[in-house]
Amino acid sequence: MDSYNKETIRNTYSAGLIHHLTLVVGLVCVGIGQTLLYTILGPASRKIGISDFSVGIIVTIAALVITLSSGMWGRLIDRLGSRNAYLAGMIFYTTGTLFLGYGLHISVNHSISALSAFYLLLVIRSLTGFLTAGIHPAAMTYVAESTSSKERGAGIALIASAYGIGSIIGPILGSVIGKVSFLLPILVASAISLLGVILGFLVLKPQKKSLTNKEKERILIRLTDKRVLPIFIGISLTYVGFSCFQQTLSFYVQDVFNLSPERSISKIGGLFATMAAFMIITQLLLIQIIKPSINFLLYCGMWSCVTGFMFLILTTQTFNGLYLACGFLGIGFGMMIPAIQSSASLAVTKDEQGGVSGFLFGASAFGYVIGPALGTYIYSINSNILFLICIVVTFLSVFSTRIVLNKK
């Protein structure tokens, strides 16, 4: 009997690991597409003829759409099942990436006016955001349903690290083949995403039962829920700082080093890849192997982010300083984001994981509502003021999260 139980546990673990790795592959595809966008959109926008602030507005409005739809996706995940919601999002993501590539192609070639290009890219990004807002929370829910509370922090970090892997591949892909064409890296990203969809259909299992109306009501996480409201504020502020830096880095590199749009792509790709590499090393090695406490991750992440932003202020006009800054920021955000997400996951019951996953994704999207527009606007005034504001919001995000941790 004991040998039978051990074999059953071993088989269950192996199956769960295969499913989680399948989710990792899909989220790697998403990470590739997203970081390609940040690597290419800045240089492309100046070739199209739209302002830096207009780019921030595109990202901000798309993020607002994601925020408004995240609650709906949280309920759909629990109603349809995390597997079905995840696959639907991946299909829409592949399609949306193709449309984005087409939109950039006709815009860069000036087949349409700069104003028309702005509205076209805005519509494509907004629709894609609405239809794909369930990918990340669905993956988080799938992992939460198959792990214990003790293992949940490591499981969530694994999902976060998947995006980080894509964040390494995406900028490298953009820097290597982006010199040939703005469109080619996006087409390659779409093809890779399609492979993730096919793998998901083959490996992931559908939900065996649906939820009752009473259960659906119970799992709904509201913004006024005192258990997670401070965490909503904390994760939102974290992504405000993250997206401010992410959205303005391409403009910063072009302006400080006086680079052309084509040449800046390879430089920007290297910086994004450095930040993503340190993020993934932190999440795969430090968190998965050492399994430090949430408090350790929170405070070490905070000081690492502060150090990174200070490097941006003090070491201008040197690429070595930029690489150091990106390294510290990768470590910092690699610690802070899973720490805050784990705090939210552990604050609710297992039945509420779907609701809190959508809630968390909406919180991060809300950070992107504020960050890109705020970042590009303040950057047009003074870049150092922008980085100082990023330091302030980093402190505030940790303070807000500590409110929940102190109660627990």
Residue ranges and their predicted role:
Residues 124-163:
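Cytoplasmic helix-loop-helix junction between adjacent transmembrane helices
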Residues 28, 110-134, 320-335:
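Hydrophobic core of transmembrane alpha-helices in multi-pass small-molecule transporters
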